[in-house]
C-alpha cells in the first residue's frame, strides 16, 4: 500500500515501466476500456473521455519531437489565442498527467506555466471526474489523480481544499474495507497530514476532515494494516480537535454523536474528560457540551459520508420511484451497500442523510413518490444487528433531543413520527420499539442534561402537532396495539399528548394508498415488470431527468417514465381555426426542428395586425401543456461549450425569446410578445429563469439582458426585484448547477437588485457545495463576479448572522475573495454576541489578525462589552501586542486620552446615531486589565511601553476613587513609571533599555489567538460610525502633562 508521494510519480513510473503506482493493489493492466475509464466492448464511448483524449492529442502533436523550450513556446502561443484553446491545453496536460505517469512532473510544470485561471479548469474537471466517473476510472488514473491533488495542495492552489473534500466524499463508509477504499482513505489522510499548515488555513476543510475520519475510525479494525491506519486517523482527529476545536464546533450536534462512537479509544476518552469537565482547555469560547448539542448540523456534513453513487441512488428513490414500486430498487441497494455484517453501521449515515438533507418539495410530497418514512422503515426492519439498530434509532431521533423551533427544521423530525404512525397497522413492533426508545432516551442520553432532552422531545412533539404533521398524538400514544407498560410510560412522560380521543389526521400528503411497509407490490403491479430488469447505471445519463436540486445518473425502468398524452382539448375550441391547426401540428410534431418551424408560424400569426389578443391566455395554456417536458428536463448541458450552449437554446419555446431579441422595444409587436410571455409566466413560473438562461447562453441575445427587465415589468408582479428573486428561487429549487452558471451574469447585469440585500446570496449559499463555492470564489478573484459592494456589504453580513453555519462560512469566504477593506465591515462587531454568532466572530478574528490595527479597528474591538466568557477582544489585542506593539500602544493611548478628556455629561448625551459605537473609559480599562492578566506569565512587555504608561497616568490623575480601586493593579504600573521618571537621568537611561525597541528580539510565547472565535455585542440596529480624523497627540505632550 505504499503510495506515491510528492515527486514520486515520475520516479515510480521510471521504476515500473510507467505503471503509475499502487492504487490499492491495482496496476495498469486494466481489463479493457480506454486510457481513462474502464468499459466493455458493448459500452458506447464516453463523451468526457473522448474530449479529454482529443485535448491530449492536441498537446502531444504540439510537443512531440521538439525541444522543451520550443514546446513551451508552442503551448503558450496556442493558449494566447483564446479561452477554448486555453481550456484544450489545460485539459490535455491534465489527461497526460493521469495517463502517463512518466511525464507527470513535466506536464504539471507545463500546466502551472500555461494556466491563466489559477488551475480552475483542472479543479473543475477533477471534481467532475470524482463525482461522476470515479468508479469507472482506471487504477493508474486513480493513483495519478491522488498524485496531482497532492501537487496542487503543495503548490497552495486556491480551491484545492474543495477537491480534497470531494475526494473524502468518495471514501466509502459502512465497513467497506476493500483494498481500493482503504488505499483512498490512507492517500487522502497522508495529503492532509503532510500539508498540515495548508489544512489549518481552511476552517471548512478542518471540520469536514474531522467529520469524515471520525466516522471512518469505527470501520477500521481487525488486521494490523487497518489498525495502523486507524491510529493515524486517531492522531489526526485528536490533533485537530485539540488545536482547532472552534473550527470543529461548526459541525454541530453530530460531532457529539460521532465522538460517542469512538469514546472507548484512549485518546478520545481523555478528550471526552476535557469536553465534560474542562471545556475551556479546548477553547476559551467553548462553554460545554450543551453548546454543541444545541447547534444543528449542516446538511453539508450529513451528505459528505455518502459516496456520490450512493447519494444519487438514494435521491432517485426519494424523487422518482413511486410508492409500491420500490422493492426492486431497495433490493439492489441492499445487495450493493448493506449485504455485509460490517455494512450495518451505514444505516445511521443513511437515516441522518434522509432526515437532514432530503427535504422534498411540496410537489413531491403531494405526489405518489416513495416517502421518506417508508425508506427509513425499510432500513429499520431489515437491520440485523442490535447495536446498529440502536444507533439507527438514535440517528432517527437525534434532532429531537435538543430541538428548538427557532433553529431546527420540522423536516428533520417529521420522518420519525411518520414512521411510527404508518407502522402501527402493518408493523406494530416497530412503532412500539421506537416509542419505547423515545421515552428511555430522555433520562439515559446524558443524565446531567435530562431536563434539556425532555424539553427537546416535548418541543418536537408540540411542533409536530402545531404544524399538523399529525393533528393528534393520542391515537398513537394510547393505541390498544401497544402493551400496557409502554402506554403507561407514555402517559407518564407526555400527559399533554394523551388526552385527545380523536383519530390522527395527517395533513402532509405523504400517505399513499397502501400503508404496508414490507414494500411488496400487488400481483397486478408486479406483472408490469415481468420483462423489465431494474438496474442502476453508473455511467449512463438520464436524459429525461426532472432534476430536482440534483443531477441524477440513472436509468429508471422504462414503464415508469412514459409520459401521459397531453390533453389540450378544452383549450382548442377557444382558438381561431388557423391557430388551432398550428397548435395541433405542434402537438403532433415528432422532432425539435419541425416543432420550431411550427412555433415560428404561431409567433408570426400572433404578431399579425388582426390577431385577437384575448386569445393569448388560451394559447399560453396550450403551450404550457405541450412543453411540460421542457420544464422538467435539464437546461444546462453537461459539457459547457459554445456549441452545446447554442444547441441547448434551440427548443421550440425559446423561439418566443429569439423573436423578442430581434425586435425594437418601442415596437407594438414587442409588447404583444411580452404579453404572451406574461400569460405563460402566470401558468408556468419557471419560464422566468428559462428566459434568464436564454439571454445568458444564446449568441442572438448577446447584450440583451435588459430585456428581462421589460419582461418583469410586463408580468403581474410588475417589479424587477420581486420577479428576479422569485425566478432565482425557482431555479435554486430545480437546478443548482444552473443557478451557479447564472450567478455571475445576474450580479453583473442587475447590481442594484442583487447587491443591496442578501436575499440572492442566501439562496446561493443555502444549496451550493464546496466545489461550487470554490468556483464562485474563482469567478470573484478573476473579476467575473462582484457579490458585495462597500455601501451594502455590512448590512448583508449582518443579515447573514441568522443563516445556517455552513451558509455563513460560505458568505464569509465569498466576502474575503473581494478586495474590500476590513474597516468597511468592522462595525459588525457591535452586532455579534459571543454565544450566538461564533461563525462570524471566528472569521472576523482570523481576518483581523492579518491586519495592522488602525485606531478605528481598536476602538471597535474595545467597544465590545466585557464578559468573563468572551475572549474575542483579549485574543485580538494579545495578537496585536505580539505583532504591532508600538502601533497598538499609540492607538490605545489616543483612545484613553480622548475618552478621559470628554466631559461625563457630554458622553451621556451622545446622539442615538453613535450609540452603538460608544466607547467608555471603563470599557477600555476593563479590556486592558484582562489583557494584563493574560500577559502575566509571558515575557511580553506591552504594558511597560511609554505611551501606555503615560495614558494610564493621565487617566489615574482625573478618575474617581471607585475606578482607582477597581483598576488598582493596572494603575500601579503607571505609578512605577512615575517613580522611575523622577530619578536622575542616568537611571532613566537604564530604564530605556526596556523600551519597545530593545524588546523586539525577546522570546515570545506561542500564540493562542487562533482558538478565539466568540464574543458579545449590542442587539441594537447598526448605524455606521463616522471615521474620526483627529490628529493624534504626540507622546511628549502627554508626558509633559503628567510630569
UniProtKB/Swiss-Prot annotation:
Residue positions where Phosphoserine is found in the record: 502, 537, 995
Domain of life: Eukaryota
GO terms under cellular component: cytoplasm; INTAC complex; integrator complex; nucleoplasm; nucleus; site of double-strand break; SOSS complex
Acidic residues composition-biased segments: 1008-1022
Similarity comment: Belongs to the Integrator subunit 3 family.
Keywords recorded for this protein, A-Z: Acetylation, Cytoplasm, DNA damage, DNA repair, Nucleus, Phosphoprotein
InterPro entries noted in UniProt: HEAT_Ints3_C (IPR056518), INTS3 (IPR045334), INTS3_N (IPR019333)
The protein, known as: Integrator complex subunit 3
Locations listed in the record: Nucleus; Cytoplasm
GO biological process, one term: snRNA processing
Principal subcellular localisation of the protein: nucleus
List of residues that carry N-acetylmethionine: 1
Subunit structure: Component of the Integrator complex, composed of core subunits INTS1, INTS2, INTS3, INTS4, INTS5, INTS6, INTS7, INTS8, INTS9/RC74, INTS10, INTS11/CPSF3L, INTS12, INTS13, INTS14 and INTS15. The core complex associates with protein phosphatase 2A subunits PPP2CA and PPP2R1A, to form the Integrator-PP2A (INTAC) complex. Component of the SOSS complex, composed of SOSS-B (SOSS-B1/NABP2 or SOSS-B2/NABP1), SOSS-A/INTS3 and SOSS-C/INIP. SOSS complexes containing SOSS-B1/NABP2 are more abundant than complexes containing SOSS-B2/NABP1.
Spans annotated as Disordered: 977-1043
UniProt function note: Component of the integrator complex, a multiprotein complex that terminates RNA polymerase II (Pol II) transcription in the promoter-proximal region of genes.
